[in-house]
């Protein structure tokens, strides 16, 4: 669509006393973005400082960090001996938030959208803004000697300056609603990130997602255990208390459909799926429904790997 379509959407939403919350991705950009193209053209110039560019080591990447979608976090900068860093796909180079010019450009962009009439944002992968600038090897957790980047990125004790700048210069002046996609903080620090005194209005409760993990790879889950799931939800609710109105979520774009996870195989019927829906809306907090969840959508079945579009699935295959 065109910008005129968005303007019309915002106008009609406000006329109906509704609000538009957009996805906001500020941890990385596209490798087709003019900033990155300028960095490729002149790595030593201004825009080379907008990214993490490092020389290789022993003929390979600067360290052993493994990207979220598989493979190294480092790819060779075209036409250069330098490597650029990416938490996710190689087409998504990470922005250098240590650079005040990057932060200024991001804040200007966020305010542009808020001035246009957007009412708030879901902040994607926001915990990834802070890096350990030493970029040292991590403990290998895979037979190939690599270490999951998720173990090396979270520097939540030092990320506050970045998030406070966004709140102070963008969110507060516009009374914007914000929800953070924050996977790695402890329960004790929830109020630091969400609520009136936190960086965001609220944050997603992923505790019961993480309780099912049993390895460094995305597909390594324990068999579903009701008590573990229940306890994780209760702990998050009790810990949030009156400080944070959590964003409750049972499924999202990174996860299979809820009936396929939380219901015994063959037991996903109208009544059981409706019970999951009741959980979504009756817990204290803000219910977030992923598209299709409102009709109890189930997982699709794909007979061949060619039918999958998911990067992780294809890479693992």
Task: Name each model feature, range by range.
Residues 1-317:
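Active-site and adjacent substrate-binding regions of carbohydrate-active enzymes
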């Amino acid at each position: 669509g065109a910008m005129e379509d968005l303007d019309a959407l915002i106008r009609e939403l406000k006329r109906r006393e509704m609000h538009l919350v957009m996805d906001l991705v500020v941890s990385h950009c596209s490798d087709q973005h003019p900033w990155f193209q300028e960095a490729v053209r002149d790595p030593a110039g201004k825009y080379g400082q907008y990214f993490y560019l490092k020389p290789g080591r022993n003929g390979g990447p600067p360290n052993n960090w493994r990207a979220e979608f598989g493979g190294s976090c480092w790819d060779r900068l075209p036409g250069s001996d330098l490597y650029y860093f990416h938490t996710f796909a190689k087409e998504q180079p990470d922005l250098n938030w240590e650079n005040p010019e990057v932060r200024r450009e991001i804040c200007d962009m966020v305010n542009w959208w808020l001035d246009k009439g957007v009412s708030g944002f879901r902040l994607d992968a926001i915990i990834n803004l802070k890096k350990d600038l030493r970029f040292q090897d991590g403990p290998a957790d895979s037979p190939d000697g690599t270490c999951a980047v998720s173990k090396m990125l979270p520097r939540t004790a030092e990320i506050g300056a970045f998030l406070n700048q966004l709140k102070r210069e963008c969110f507060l002046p516009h009374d914007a609603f914000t929800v953070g996609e924050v996977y790695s903080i402890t329960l004790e620090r929830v109020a630091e990130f969400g609520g009136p005194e936190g960086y965001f209005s609220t944050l997603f409760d992923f505790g019961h997602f993480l309780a099912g993990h049993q390895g460094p790879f995305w597909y390594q889950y324990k068999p579903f255990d009701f008590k573990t799931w229940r306890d994780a939800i209760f702990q998050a609710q009790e810990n949030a208390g009156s400080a944070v109105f959590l964003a409750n979520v049972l499924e999202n774009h990174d996860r299979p459909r809820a009936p396929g996870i939380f219901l015994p195989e063959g037991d996903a019927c109208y009544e059981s799926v409706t019970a999951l829906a009741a959980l979504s809306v009756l817990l204290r907090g803000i219910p977030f429904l992923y598209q299709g969840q409102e009709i109890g959508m189930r997982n699709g079945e794909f007979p061949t790997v060619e039918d999958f579009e998911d990067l992780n699935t294809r890479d693992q295959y």
